[in-house]
Amino acid sequence: METFVYLLFMVAVGALIGGVTNFIAIVMLFRPYEPMYVFGKRLPFTPGLIPKRRRELAEQLGKTVVEHLVTPEGLRRKLMDPSFTAEMAEWGREWLRKWLARKETPAELLERLGIRSPAERLEAMAAEQAERAYERWSETWRLRPIRDVLPAELKQTMEARVESLAGYLADRTLDYFRSEEGKQQISSMIERFFQERGMVGNMLQMLLGNVNFVDKVQAELGKFLRHAGTREVLSRLLWTEWNKWLDYPLATVEEMIGRRRIDEAVRSAARRLVQSGSWLHRPLDELIAPYEQPLFDRLIPQAAATVSCLLSDKIEAIVAQLGLADIVRDQVESFSLRRLEAIILSIARRELKMITYLGALLGGLIGAVQGVIGLWL
């Protein structure tokens, strides 16, 4: 019985010494926070290891984070992960929904961005940009023939209407000469004709009779205008003039109209385009409503994929510019020692307890061995 009690005592003493020793060693990692002095001499192991090496710990943590944890390669894999891209697209959709739900108008948005009187400024900006755009376009095309400037569809449409235009002109002319105004015009022309011939003209007028002669001329004009040959000649004339006009350089048209009038027309058209409708004062969700489905289904996912690719291509420069190692170091150095201790303990509390228990276990085993050796001797 005495032997058992002796061995048990040795095991208990060894376990106590081992456990307390490891516990003190763990505590000395953090405590004391400040160096301790006795008779002007600093006690060894003060301050604790972590307070003493906090700067080195902060620098090492920063390097570890950049070199092994938050690396450019890891960030690139995350950015190019389809699930992350899909999540980014969903973020974009959610943000856009919240933004549209505010019922903000373009005018309110521009004013919130610091742009006062947005309608007037947009009109002036649109007019200026339109004039500059026309000037650039004119510099490129003004010496080219009009046939090269006109869109092919417009040119085909105009050419297809030349034939019908000839018939239209003939019919309108025929309608005019059939009217009372046209008849009076014919009568006036005949009278001037006879008057210009002097006495001979007066004699002819007396013989023929003005009224009957007007009716005859009117009838002949009608036959002439209805004749297919007349319309064919008119069509050829229109084709000739059309092709001649197509060969003119654009500068000729500018000179005919006047550059100042063209500039004024362009600026006026740009202003009317901005003024057309009340879109500046309509909620953005109403303006975007017709395009909402393609915007949410295609444009936002494409934008998310594009942003991911751009960030992935520049990730090394971004990480270097951010200075993650410096951020981690500065953050760790800004922690109080008590908070730093709490952080480390929250991570490794279980392991530190196991180290204490392991010290007690080893101390108990050593005590048992010592007890056996003592009994043997």
UniProtKB/Swiss-Prot annotation:
It comes from the Bacteria. It is a multi-pass membrane protein. InterPro entries: DUF445, UCP032178. One of its GO terms (cellular component) is plasma membrane. It is found in: Cell membrane. Pfam families: DUF445. The chain crosses the membrane at residues 7-27, 357-377. Belongs to the UPF0754 family. This is UPF0754 membrane protein GK0639.
